[in-house]
């Protein structure tokens, strides 16, 4: 589909206009009722006009963000950066990252005739939804942040997800890829315009992949022995095949220096080198972690490829207006007690392992609360959560001496208790709670410096209620 074809869409029929009108009416009703229902307008529109996405006109430029871990955070960062830079943007923050959520966002961002109100669309895209969305909405830029194992019952394994994205990307799309991920950096060779970003070796890197499982143990090209030179996070890093020589692609944007104390990092723009000298720019990062760094660098590189000047990006980040969303990480305090909520994607061993490593790497004595069971899934008597992923996640982090207490809350508490015991966590330190309020009341506030809550991304409201109750206890003590 050409840019002109995408802008106008397939021919608009009476069925399309009816679907658009009903979708807009659904959006208006939801707004009046103060309900989110982000996918409802798209769902009803698609029910009336099954090829609705093909027919609705698109903004002049389209950017999608996909990948296993960090796509929501990265997409939100990119949205904020582009809005601060003055671009006229439609996003799917209030919709969803599958086809009906994207349709809902386009409905809300269109006139009564279907014409787009905004010149740029920047949206998060679910990996499996690539096969339904990309044939009808060709992105100018597709950012793939990474590929890991994910929810087993839905996504099977990284090879399967890779194959879905790989076959769906149009040849005309400009790919922005993580050169440190030897899985996703190989996506869609039919797309010849490719931009790679990378983080250079850091002092605290590991010699090989961290964790009890690794998503890339053999060369993805020949199956030979893959030898890691260093790893930043899980399998993300630098490696080479001892058989065929396969290795990471050369980066166009390279993070050359990180100052954790100053909360700054420097990016060398190799792709913009002149006379053998590449320009370098230093940026602010609001809260450092290797995960946050990857997410922010991915957003910055995409913004640069959209034509935003590096100096403008420096100004935006220095203002402090753009940061990791509070729905993923937030910290408060009560009488000098740190209260930290960190999102951990449920049924995702990599996300949970990373969250636990970050929590346990924080200084001081701590109580850790695990709210990893999907709250809404647990209310459905016809569904059950696959708990095998517990044995792919690194709960061994919680066996450290600085973790004074572990409180487990959720429908699968007994399953998680067994995993914690196998991980070597002292049973005397573990308590089980029925509700988030019970979990807050079970925390022993004596002898600790902070309370950390790792929660499933669908349990944000429960995590907030938990922290409110802990705050209340501290202030009333």
Protein language model annotation of sequence segments:
Residues 2-31, 36-38, 216, 223, ...:
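ATP-dependent carboxylate-amine ligase
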Residues 4-218:
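Phosphate-binding loop of NTP-binding sites
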Residues 60, 122, 148-336, 418-421:
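Acidic, Mg2+-coordinating active-site environments of NTP-dependent enzymes
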Residues 68, 96-97, 288-290, 307, ...:
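Short, surface-exposed acidic/glycine-rich loop or hinge patches that mediate macromolecular interfaces
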Residues 74-75, 131-133, 153-154, 186-188, ...:
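Short glycine-/acidic-enriched loop or helix-start segments at secondary-structure transitions
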Residues 78, 82, 102-106, 296-306, ...:
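Buried hydrophobic packing segments
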Residues 95, 126, 180, 288, ...:
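Short beta->alpha junction loops/turns
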Residues 110-115, 273, 362-363, 395-398:
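Alpha-helix termini
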């Amino acid at each position: 589909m050409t840019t002109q074809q995408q802008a106008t869409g397939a021919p608009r029929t009476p069925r399309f206009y009816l679907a658009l009108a009903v979708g807009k009416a659904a959006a208006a009703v939801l707004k009046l009722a103060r309900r989110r229902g982000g996918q409802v307008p798209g769902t009803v529109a698609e029910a009336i006009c099954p090829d609705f996405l093909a027919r609705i006109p698109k903004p002049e430029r389209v950017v999608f963000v996909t990948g296993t871990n960090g796509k929501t955070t990265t997409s939100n960062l990119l949205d904020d950066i582009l809005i601060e830079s003055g671009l006229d943007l439609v996003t799917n923050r209030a919709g969803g990252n599958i086809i009906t959520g994207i349709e809902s966002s386009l409905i809300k961002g269109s006139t009564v005739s279907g014409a787009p109100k905004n010149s740029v669309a920047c949206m998060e895209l679910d990996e499996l939804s690539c096969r339904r969305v990309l044939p009808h909405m060709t992105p100018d830029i597709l950012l793939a942040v990474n590929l890991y194992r994910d929810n087993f019952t839905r996504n099977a394994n990284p090879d399967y997800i890779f194959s879905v994205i790989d076959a769906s990307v149009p040849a005309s799309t400009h790919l922005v890829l993580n050169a440190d991920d030897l899985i996703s950096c190989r996506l869609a060779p039919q797309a010849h315009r490719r931009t790679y970003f990378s983080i250079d070796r850091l002092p605290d890197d590991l010699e090989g992949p961290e964790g009890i499982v690794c998503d890339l143990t053999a060369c993805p090209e020949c199956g030979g022995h893959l030898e890691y030179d260093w790893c930043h996070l899980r399998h993300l890093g630098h490696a080479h095949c001892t058989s065929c020589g396969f290795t990471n692609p050369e980066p166009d944007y390279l993070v050359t220096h990180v100052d954790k104390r100053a909360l700054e990092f420097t990016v060398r723009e190799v792709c913009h080198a002149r006379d053998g000298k590449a320009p370098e720019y230093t940026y602010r990062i609001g809260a450092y972690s290797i995960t946050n760094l990857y997410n922010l660098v991915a957003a910055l590189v995409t913004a640069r490829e959209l034509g935003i000047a590096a100096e403008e990006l420096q100004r935006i980040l220095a203002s402090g207006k753009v940061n990791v969303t509070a729905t993923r990480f937030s910290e408060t305090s009560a009488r000098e007690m740190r209260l930290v909520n960190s999102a951990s994607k449920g049924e995702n061993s990599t996300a949970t392992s990373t969250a636990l490593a970050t929590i346990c790497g924080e200084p001081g004595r701590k109580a850790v609360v695990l709210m990893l069971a999907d709250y809404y899934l647990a209310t459905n008597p016809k569904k059950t959560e696959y708990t095998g992923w517990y044995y792919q996640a690194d709960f061994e982090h919680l066996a450290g001496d600085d973790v004074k207490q572990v409180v487990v809350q959720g429908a699968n508490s007994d399953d998680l208790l067994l995993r914690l015991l196998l991980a070597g966590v002292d049973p005397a330190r573990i308590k089980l709670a029925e509700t988030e309020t019970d979990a807050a009341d079970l925390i022993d506030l004596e002898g600790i410096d902070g309370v950390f809550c790792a929660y499933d991304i669908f349990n944000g409201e429960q995590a907030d209620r938990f922290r409110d109750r802990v705050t209340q206890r501290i202030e009333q003590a």
